[in-house]
Amino acid sequence: MSFSPRGPSRPVLRRRRRGAALPTVVILVAVVIAVVVGARITADVWWFDQLGFLPTFTTKLWLQVLLFTLGALLLAAAVAVSLTLGYRARPIYAPVSDEQAGLDRYRESLEPLRRLVVVVLSAAAGLFGGSVAMSRWETLLLWWNRVDFGTRDEQFRMDQGFYVFTLPWLAFLVSFLTAAVVLAGIAGLAAHYLYGGLRLSGAGPRTTRAARVHLASLAAAFLLLRAAGYWLDRYELMTTSSGYVRGVVGPTYTDVHAVLPSKAILALIAVVVALLFVAAAVGTSWRLPAIGTGLLVVSAIAIGGIYPWAVQRFQVTPNRQSLESEYVGKNIDATRDAYDLSDVEVSTYAADTTASQGQLSEDAQTIPSVRLLDPSVVSQAFQQTQGQRGYYKFGETLDVDRYATPDGGTQDAVVAARELNLAGLADNQRTWVNEHTIYTHGYGVVVAQGNDRAPDGSPSYVEANVPTSGDLDLEQPRIYFGEGTTTYSIVGGRDNEIDYPDGSAGGFATTEYDGSGGVAVGSLLQKLVYGLKFGDQNILLSGSVTPESRILYDRTPRERVEKVAPWLTMDGDAYPSIVDGRVVWILDGYTTSNSYPYSAATELGDATTDALTQTQGSSVQALQDRTVNYVRNSVKATVDAYTGKVDLYAWDDTDPVLKAWMKAFPGAVEPLSAIDGSLMQHLRYPQDMFKVQREVLTRYHVTDPASFLTGQDFWDVPGDPTVDAAAGTVRPSQPPYYLTLRMPEQDTPTYSLTTTYVPASNANASGTQVLRGFAAVDSDAGSTKGTKSEGYGTIRLLELPQSTTVNGPVQIQNNIRSDTAVADQVRLLSVGDNSRVIYGNLLTLPVGGGLLYVEPIYAQSTGDNSFPRLSRVVAVFGDNIAIANTLDEALDEVFGGNSGAGAGDEGAPPPTAGTPAPTDGATGGPAPDPATGDAQVQLQQALDNAKRAIQDSSAALAEGDFTKYGEAQQRLRAAVDAASAAEARLERSGTSGPTSSSSPSASSAPPVPGETPAATPTP
């Protein structure tokens, strides 16, 4: 038989080609991955180096690499060694049986792939082990740099630092080694069974000597690790809740007298059984270790489960108060210490509910500081009056800060940064050149007085406009780093960045970035690295990237601080301030632990979620869902809005957790003494810290163990009364509010963060929302370089006695809405269904010996350019409710014609929803023309007529005179029609504020030198 010479060569060639193709593809994929990963790491090195935090990055990186390597090697080796031993220790002559005959087929099928299977399984175990170990870099670093707390627990006499730093690392080591032994045991069992070293049936010994030594050794190692786990469980009882006393963390009576001894006994039994397995490894029988294992299981059930249950059921439950009080007291003390609540100043406040003339005379300094501007409502007013162009935007929720007044005092202010908004560009402007090299930054901070308004109900600004102007000496208004800057920008090298709109021929002033922020991107290598990092070829190809260019990325303040300090938990609200003529973002950082002995655990996400965090588009975020039982506001951070420079300051330098991190990253955190006075005066007590503390205080304001066990005096944070909740749903919590007020124990008003409390639902079956507590924390950090004010951080808690009945916020809001006078005014503000009424934040103030509620009411017409205007103010004291154009008038009405304290807004005219918005960005806007003035007069007259008609209607109904009632209703309809017509004329003739359509058109955008015009640039 003859064969064609080409016949056999073709399949061989195909096999060789297929065989060579697979490694080539694998190598190419590996090279691509390596290049991309290398580019990202290189970019990170440049980014951290530019900020001066390169040691932080390298320490974390190399520690993660080390842990990944060790973890991967350990688990991979455990699996590989067990599989290899199982194969090499296979018997030469396996007994003949049906079981072995069936396994022979599997052995034959597996043999060609045996080594590959070992490699794949070992690699999978290694990847799992490496990823788990790598994630514990913080645990290792804290243990390595641990410090003492200086106090010891009463149970084991161990320093608190042992539980916070050492115990988590030891527990991880034991659990990780246990996982390695378990995987090795599973692999060993499978290998020995497959290759005949372990049999389930047949005559004679069921294991070979080699299999017995291997498996018994692994069992002994597992039991020794289990013994270590039992021993550590004793200490972990200090940081967990056994459930014997609901919600109480730390050992209770049953834990101390039953669980702790049982853990020690089980640890001893596990060691004994481990020795029995060692004996089995050198002996010939599994009998003793099998008996020992059974004894361990029975002991775990009887000693570890049944005995503690019996002690709890028959000894503790009948005597709960006497036996558990000692341990509940330890939990109360430790929890208050862990959340920095040990020094809360508590006083009983028998609030007066009767209003009388002059009652607020002692609070004459507080009343003028009442903040009427609601930061969660007035964003649209800022946008319409100060937005200027569509590519500028303010946050949905604005911030509260303080600024000096000409008389040397301070005033609460609502602040917002005018940030870049690329979504506001027209479609034909959304090009790569425009978005990354032309529109690069926001401009200016807008500051409005918190306790005042303009004549038309819009905010009264003290710093505003473009170019910026005002009383606060803002010298560098450009915002290259802000909460809205989520894309990268390439700046420098060309004077073509749009700075702000002006009256020039092009319509815009331009600028060139000359700050130190960002990373150089002018060289070919730098372009390649960042092109790979962002997956954008334009960085490499565009002529807009010059040798002098710098790339700005990771630009939001929160992500910048989180990158340079990954060990911090960041507050959900960064706020802008003007410090030394520059815009600076201020953030708060927390050090936390979930291992503080005896302290109750808190879910950060739940505790910090409120009505603001659930508002769509809000810049205020809740903290991540994580359980902690220790928290400190240990760091204040700042981010320069122009350079992106990050500074970390040790705010609580007594915090042991911060001390450990400062040892781990020396030089990363500056001392408190480095904080300049100009920055200090803008630092405040953080919202999220207070939210967590107020959540803890709902239960831990009760310091008597017996009362704590009953739970009858627990509180809740009330729901936000301004949020409409559907039937059967729960309102989100009312957020805490920054207010300048004087607590009853204080001599002068202080900038504070406040909250209220109502009875817990399970402690108040009737569901009445009466007030039970009011808390305020001193938030004024002072203005002295490197020194916090003496009272900063002091929490003052007013507890209302059970005999005092003061309505809570939700009930007060219901009373306001059902009040006849308020309803009449709301109807006036909603004339012709062309307006909507918005209830602002309901503020609570402990003044006049009682509790005063103040709520601003905003009106907004339905026009495209309208915004909420502060139109009325409601004041409530006891059962007295008043609504007026000003707070001054409302207070006087509540307190019998004279409150005794002036609010300072007595001259404010009654604004309406239809007043047009100013166009020039200033508070007052241009003078209205005569037609507009006539319309305003006609609108006010119509509103007055409507008010009188409503009053006449009510009087006629009360008298039963339906003829007069019908006449009054006709006059009301006529007044409504007249008001609607006047409002329509105002909308047509009024000068409306800028909208997104005001953004630069294709023809008005400045061209890029050397490129096509900015309207249609191509990279």
Curated annotation (Swiss-Prot):
It is a multi-pass membrane protein. It comes from the Bacteria. It is found in: Cell membrane. Residues 897-934, 977-1019 are annotated as: Disordered. Residues 1006-1019 have a biased composition (Pro residues). GO terms for cellular component: extracellular region; plasma membrane. Keywords: Cell membrane, Membrane, Transmembrane, Transmembrane helix. Residues 977-1005 have a biased composition (Low complexity). HAMAP family: UPF0182. This is UPF0182 protein Krad_1193.
